[in-house]
């Protein structure tokens, strides 16, 4: 723990230097901020887990500048992989593929697969291009809590757990999409949707045909039943259900049922604002079960999971 503030910069070259020296860098992406380490430095990768208080068996996602580099770390030779990578990268899509031998067990949690993607944020694209290799990066927050979409969120969550002599926050402004990447397992036939995200399942299906829902044990980031959780109790209200009889000064309402793009962009900031308001209950108006609404429903359901769901007529 430290009282000296962590350094903040908008210079990708400075971030590359930190990574090459074995430090951690909080990076902006189009989805959320990630906490990155050079994938070839196991001690640095281990610090990701301790900084986040993340279980060591929970796999990380590798981020690279382009497909050619991605193929050094994962088997992306299948037609499915090539179609998705060439169409959706850079962008909010993670492919779960067979790992290459040089990928460390600490990155994959000992699994034979690895998640990999090409982020679209311009600052992180510059960082990755200059770095020339690969970085491992989960979200830059304490494990299981609300994801960060601004540099200030990172400071609030893990600023005191970073080393000002070794680490850095790369400030790229607010994240554009606001929810994590879609994860597709391309090792199965048909491919499986492991986590809905910034690219809809409908879009994926248009590209590669049928995509199954996830089955079997958790094998990628974001698959735990409880995740993205605020401190405040949550209640999820489906379209058409009545709101509970609770005075307005005791609740914080998050409307995810209307403009889905805006709802995704604002979701984690709204959950943080609700916690800061110290209300007794967050009421989330649920989006439709399609498009970006599927990702929003996933995040909201997991955010409320450890509190019970209850109907619209009870606090749960």
Label every PLM stretch briefly:
Residues 1-316:
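Active-site-adjacent structural elements in enzyme catalytic cores
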């Amino acid at each position: 723990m430290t009282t000296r503030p962590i350094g903040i910069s908008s210079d990708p070259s400075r971030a590359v230097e930190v990574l090459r020296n074995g430090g951690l860098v909080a990076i902006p992406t189009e989805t959320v901020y990630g906490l990155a380490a050079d994938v070839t430095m196991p001690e640095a990768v281990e610090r990701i887990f301790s900084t986040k208080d993340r279980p060591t068996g929970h796999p990380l996602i590798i981020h690279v500048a382009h497909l050619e580099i991605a193929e050094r770390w994962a088997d992306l030779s299948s037609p499915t992989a090539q179609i998705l990578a060439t169409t959706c990268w850079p962008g909010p899509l993670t492919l779960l593929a067979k790992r290459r031998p040089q990928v460390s067990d600490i990155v994959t949690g000992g699994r034979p697969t690895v998640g990999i993607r090409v982020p679209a944020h311009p600052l992180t694209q510059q960082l990755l291009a200059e770095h020339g290799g690969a970085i491992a990066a989960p979200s830059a927050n304490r494990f299981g809590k609300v994801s960060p979409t601004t540099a200030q969120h990172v400071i609030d969550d893990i600023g005191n757990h970073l080393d000002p002599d070794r680490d850095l926050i790369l400030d790229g402004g607010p994240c554009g999409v606001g929810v994590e990447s879609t994860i597709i397992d391309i090792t199965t036939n048909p491919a499986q949707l492991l986590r809905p995200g910034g690219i809809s399942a409908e879009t994926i299906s248009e590209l590669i045909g049928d995509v199954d829902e996830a089955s079997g044990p958790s094998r990628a980031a974001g698959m735990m039943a409880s995740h993205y959780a605020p401190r405040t109790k949550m209640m999820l209200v489906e379209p058409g259900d009545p709101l509970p009889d609770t005075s307005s000064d005791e609740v914080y309402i998050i409307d995810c049922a209307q403009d889905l793009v805006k709802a995704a962009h604002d979701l984690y900031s709204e959950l943080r604002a609700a916690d800061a308001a110290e209300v007794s209950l967050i009421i989330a108006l649920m989006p439709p079960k399609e498009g970006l609404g599927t990702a929003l429903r996933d995040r909201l359901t997991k955010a409320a999971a450890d509190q019970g769901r209850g109907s619209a007529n009870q606090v749960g």
